[in-house]
Amino acid sequence: IAAIDFGYDHPTAVVWIAWDRDEDIVYVYDCYSMSKQIPSYHGSHINEREGSDWIPIVWPHDGYQHDKGSGITLAEQYRDAYVNMLPFHFENPPALGQKKGGNSVETGLMDMLDRMESGRFKVFNTLYDWFGEYRMYHRKDGKLVKLKDDLMSATRYATLSLRHSTTKGSRWNDKGRLGPDVAVV
């Protein structure tokens, strides 16, 4: 699965992860970050990645923002650029007994921290931009500093969206996951 954090003045960031379901280990294996570019530009770079035709992209609720000129939502602009966006925006996994999850940042951070401390979160050592941002991620007076956190946000979205991950040969459409033996018409 992959996840995007939208930006313009601050970077648009995308993180790709693989999930070993048997061992419950998350591997961050690729990332992309660029500012001051339009969705079609980012889309072409996303689509250069191997698996872009079947790896779903998780996106936050700000993907519903409309372009002032065209009226097209940000998520739709990425779909128009052939990016494999999930048909719904990111939500944290629902708590026990709940039907919907929220957008709490702490939920994702605690999940990532738990994975890091237990050896179930690994990042390829070639992802210099990711590690640069990770080293700067911090709190001040108990609150997260929301600067240069775009790759971390995308990582959080992806890590908490493992339930939407898929394998090669499976796809998503607006009704949900399609298995490898289901034709996309």
Regions found by a protein language model. Give the residues of each.
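Two-metal-ion RNase H-like nuclease active-site motif
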Residues: 1-8, 59-60
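Aromatic side chains
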Residues: 6-8, 137, 157
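Hydrophobic/aromatic-lined pockets within catalytic cores
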Residues: 8, 19, 159, 163
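Stable alpha-helical structural segments in soluble proteins, enriched in small hydrophobic residues
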Residues: 150-165
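Alpha-helical architecture
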Residues: 3, 131, 147-151
